[in-house]
C-alpha cells in the first residue's frame, strides 16, 4: 500500500515540496534564508491581522488607534512591535537571500530569479504603504515625498499623483487606500512565493559549487527540515531580543508625533531598509533622473543573468569576482548610511560616488572580472 503522503492529491503536493524533495547534499547555511523569509511572512500576516482588528484607517483616529493598541489591548504592544520590527527582519533576510543568489550564481535560474525580483518590488511596496498607516510625522511626510516622485513622469505625472492621493494632498482617502493595499499585498506575495518555489523545484536548488548534483541528492526531510528549524529558532531568539529590549531602535522618533501638514520634520527619510535606494535617488540633482536611477537600482538585478560572462557559475573559486562582490556589499552599506544623512557636503559627493560605483560594479566590473578569470584559467 502506498504511503498516504505519496498518494493523497493534497498531501502529495506538500510531500514533493517539503519532504521527499531531492536536495543537493552540500548546501550551506546561506540557503536557510528562503525558509526564514516564509517564516517572516507568516509572522507579518498573523500580527498584521490582529493589528487590523483594532486599527482605524482615518486621519483623525489612526494615530490614536495605534496608541490604543499599545496601551489598552492585551499584548498589543508586543504585536505592534513584532509587526514593526518584523519588517526589518524580513528585509534583512531578503537582502541576504538576494546576496546569496548573486554570490553563488542562482540568478541563472531566470524564471525563479525574475519572480524573486517581482517579490522584492511587492515587498517594498507593502512596507512603504504600511509605514504610512501609524499617521505620525514621518509617515505623512514620507508618503508625501515618495508619492510626489511620480509627478516627475512626463505629461501624466501630476494626474497620476492626484489619482493615488485621491485628492490634492495626502489625506483621508490616501490613508484608507494605503490600508487596503497593505492588507491585500501580503496575500499576493504569498501566492507569488508559491510560484517562486514552483519554478525552483522545476530546476532543483543550486549549490555552493555551482555544479549539477543530480547524482547524489538527498531528501529534504529530515536533513534540511532540521537545519531550517535550527535557523528559525536562532532568528526568533535574535528577533525577540530586538522586540523586547530595543523595540524603537530601528524606528524614527518623529513618528511618535502625530502628522501635521503644517510642520515639516528637519530630515525626511524612509525606514533603514530603503535608505540605499533613497541615497541613489538623492544623488542625482534632476527629479526624473533620480526616479529612473531609483527604479534601475532594483531592476538592474534582472540583467544579472545576461551579464554573466564567467565559465563558472559560483563565485566560490573566483577571487576577483569575490572582491567585487564584497566591495558591492560595502558600497550598499555606505549608501544606507548616506541615505540617513542630511543633503550637505561631504555627504553629497560621497553619495554620488557610491551610486556610480554601485552601477559600475554590476554593469561593467563584474562581467569584466568574469572574462579576466576565464583568461587566467586559460578557458577559451
UniProtKB/Swiss-Prot annotation:
> Which residues hold heme b b566?
97, 196
Locations listed in the record: Mitochondrion inner membrane
The UniProt entry, under Pfam families, shows: Cytochrom_B_C, Cytochrome_B
According to the lineage, what is the superkingdom? Answer: Eukaryota
Indicate which residues the UniProt annotation says bind heme b b562: 83, 182
Q: Which PROSITE patterns match?
A: CYTB_CTER, CYTB_NTER
| Free-text remark on how the cofactor is bound | Binds 2 heme b groups non-covalently.
State the function annotated in the UniProt record. Answer: Component of the ubiquinol-cytochrome c reductase complex (complex III or cytochrome b-c1 complex) that is part of the mitochondrial respiratory chain. The b-c1 complex mediates electron transfer from ubiquinol to cytochrome c. Contributes to the generation of a proton gradient across the mitochondrial membrane that is then used for ATP synthesis.
Q: What is this protein called?
A: Cytochrome b
The taxonomic lineage of its organism, from the top, reads:
Eukaryota, Metazoa, Chordata, Craniata, Vertebrata
Amino acid at each position: 500500500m502506498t504511503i498516504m503522503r505519496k498518494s493523497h492529491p493534497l498531501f502529495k503536493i506538500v510531500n514533493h515540496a517539503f519532504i521527499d524533495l531531492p536536495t543537493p547534499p552540500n548546501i550551506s547555511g546561506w540557503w536557510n534564508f528562503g525558509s526564514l523569509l516564509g517564516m517572516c511572512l507568516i509572522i507579518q500576516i498573523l500580527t498584521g491581522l490582529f493589528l487590523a482588528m483594532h486599527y482605524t484607517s482615518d486621519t483623525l483616529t489612526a494615530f490614536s488607534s495605534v496608541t490604543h493598541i499599545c496601551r489598552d489591548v492585551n499584548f498589543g504592544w508586543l504585536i505592534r512591535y513584532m509587526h514593526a520590527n518584523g519588517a526589518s527582519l524580513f528585509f534583512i533576510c531578503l537582502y541576504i537571500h538576494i546576496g546569496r543568489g548573486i554570490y553563488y550564481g542562482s540568478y541563472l535560474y531566470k524564471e525563479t530569479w525574475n519572480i524573486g525580483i517581482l517579490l522584492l518590488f511587492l515587498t517594498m511596496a507593502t512596507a512603504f504603504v504600511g509605514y504610512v498607516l501609524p499617521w505620525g510625522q514621518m509617515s505623512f511626510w514620507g508618503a508625501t515625498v515618495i508619492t510626489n516622485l511620480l509627478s516627475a513622469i512626463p505629461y501624466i505625472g501630476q494626474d497620476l499623483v492626484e489619482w493615488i492621493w485621491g485628492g490634492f494632498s495626502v489625506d483621508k482617502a490616501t490613508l484608507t487606500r494605503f490600508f487596503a493595499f497593505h492588507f491585500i499585498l501580503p496575500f499576493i506575495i504569498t501566492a507569488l512565493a508559491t510560484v517562486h518555489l514552483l519554478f525552483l523545484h522545476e530546476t532543483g536548488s543550486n549549490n555552493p559549487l555551482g555544479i549539477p548534483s543530480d547524482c547524489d541528492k538527498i531528501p529534504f526531510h529530515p536533513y534540511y527540515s532540521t537545519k531550517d528549524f535550527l535557523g528559525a529558532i536562532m532568528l526568533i531568539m535574535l528577533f525577540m531580543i530586538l522586540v523586547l529590549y530595543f523595540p524603537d531602535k530601528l524606528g524614527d522618533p518623529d513618528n511618535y508625533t502625530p502628522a501635521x501638514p503644517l510642520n515639516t520634520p528637519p530630515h525626511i527619510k524612509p525606514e533603514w531598509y530603503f535608505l540605499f535606494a533613497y541615497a541613489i535617488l538623492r544623488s542625482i540633482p534632476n527629479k526624473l533622473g533620480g526616479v529612473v536611477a531609483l527604479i534601475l537600482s532594483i531592476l538592474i538585478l534582472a540583467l544579472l543573468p545576461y551579464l554573466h560572462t564567467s565559465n563558472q557559475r559560483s563565485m566560490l573559486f573566483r577571487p576577483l569576482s569575490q572582491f567585487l562582490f564584497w566591495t558591492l556589499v560595502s558600497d550598499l552599506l555606505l549608501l544606507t548610511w548616506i541615505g540617513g544623512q542630511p543633503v550637505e557636503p561631504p555627504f553629497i559627493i560621497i553619495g554620488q560616488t557610491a551610486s556610480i560605483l554601485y552601477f559600475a560594479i554590476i554593469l561593467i566590473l563584474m562581467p569584466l572580472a568574469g572574462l579576466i578569470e576565464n583568461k587566467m584559467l586559460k578557458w577559451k
